[in-house]
């Protein structure tokens, strides 16, 4: 791992992180609603450089069609980005075996996100964490609410870019993946993705309370208060957003200032 980039993220575990997410397909950053209806948002290297300059704590790159389409890892893009930004990079999409983790780390990633492959082979998470360390391994969970109104809340895990239902309970799955060695959980609400209606705070809080590792809240950010809510109500350690950054609604600095003014510890630059 790149020690200088990890150090740049801030040493305090109490500091809440703001993480722009770059969903990539065909070499471009895109953004959709509920995992469909994708809109082009720009060049990944240029966008990454902009967020680095704005003071983002980390960046997350997700190749959203690698698993469903079966194509190779986005190594050239990661190599370009890693050469130009100085904050931790988490990369996911198309990771199928431990050797893929090594290839992405060699390309410049600091952490590797595993989603569909973890469901297909949970031992992959354990093996990757044992070999590279839990600090390198993020398990991404795409969850959709499966309970009817009035029933106890439940969420189901989906894989393959939200295309395939698994029957797995999201909270139980997060707990299992933490036990297998995941150092973080990247939790996306499919119901809220791209809607700008705010995080599914009930889901975020349920998973945050269930696991002993940091949870990154994802899916639904439409304004600055949503980010703060993810930390205060959802109890997330970090908040991830895309649309509000990609299309110029807010800068990372504006988000951090807003959270700091409300007593949330963030790294200000």
Curated annotation (Swiss-Prot):
<dbReference type="GO" id="GO:0000105">
    <property type="term" value="P:L-histidine biosynthetic process"/>
</dbReference>
<dbReference type="GO" id="GO:0016829">
    <property type="term" value="F:lyase activity"/>
</dbReference>
<dbReference type="InterPro" id="IPR006062">
    <property type="entry name" value="His_biosynth"/>
</dbReference>
<keyword id="KW-0963">Cytoplasm</keyword>
<keyword id="KW-0456">Lyase</keyword>
<protein>
    <recommendedName>
        <fullName>Imidazole glycerol phosphate synthase subunit HisF</fullName>
        <ecNumber>4.3.2.10</ecNumber>
    </recommendedName>
</protein>
<comment type="pathway">
    <text>Amino-acid biosynthesis; L-histidine biosynthesis; L-histidine from 5-phospho-alpha-D-ribose 1-diphosphate: step 5/9.</text>
</comment>
<dbReference type="InterPro" id="IPR050064">
    <property type="entry name" value="IGPS_HisA/HisF"/>
</dbReference>
<feature type="active site">
    <location>
        <position position="142"/>
    </location>
</feature>
<feature type="active site">
    <location>
        <position position="23"/>
    </location>
</feature>
<dbReference type="GO" id="GO:0000107">
    <property type="term" value="F:imidazoleglycerol-phosphate synthase activity"/>
</dbReference>
<dbReference type="InterPro" id="IPR004651">
    <property type="entry name" value="HisF"/>
</dbReference>
<dbReference type="InterPro" id="IPR013785">
    <property type="entry name" value="Aldolase_TIM"/>
</dbReference>
<keyword id="KW-0028">Amino-acid biosynthesis</keyword>
<comment type="function">
    <text>IGPS catalyzes the conversion of PRFAR and glutamine to IGP, AICAR and glutamate. The HisF subunit catalyzes the cyclization activity that produces IGP and AICAR from PRFAR using the ammonia provided by the HisH subunit.</text>
</comment>
<comment type="subunit">
    <text>Heterodimer of HisH and HisF.</text>
</comment>
<comment type="similarity">
    <text>Belongs to the HisA/HisF family.</text>
</comment>
<dbReference type="GO" id="GO:0005737">
    <property type="term" value="C:cytoplasm"/>
</dbReference>
<keyword id="KW-0368">Histidine biosynthesis</keyword>
<dbReference type="Pfam" id="PF00977">
    <property type="entry name" value="His_biosynth"/>
</dbReference>
<dbReference type="InterPro" id="IPR011060">
    <property type="entry name" value="RibuloseP-bd_barrel"/>
</dbReference>
